[in-house]
Amino acid sequence: MLEALRTAGNPGRGAHEPTLHASRLVYAARCAISKLLNAPDPSCIAFAANATQALNTALGGLFAPGDHIITTVCEHNSVLRALYRLRDQEGVQLSFAGVDEKGRLQYDGWQGLIQPNTKAVV
């Protein structure tokens, strides 16, 4: 444990060498991902503890009351919970695209779901 305390650093949480080293590694990762995704700047890249946290952060910051989102009932629970929260607490409108008896998306009905205030298909 003492070895970990002496050598481990928490990025952005101090000025000792292990922390500075960790910060440089995180920045290098941001640069590499930024380049891969053609992002305008490494600061546009955000890390999260897991996919659910990232999804909630992204969805929670993208929509305003009155915005419309198209999704399906087949989405993962973490997606649907985030969308239902946006609907129930933020006034976002949801439409659900249909699926057939085997759970396959029925694309022929999607165009009819698009509204002037549609901001995303999730």
Which functions belong to the PLM regions below?
Residues M1-V122:
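Pyridoxal 5′-phosphate
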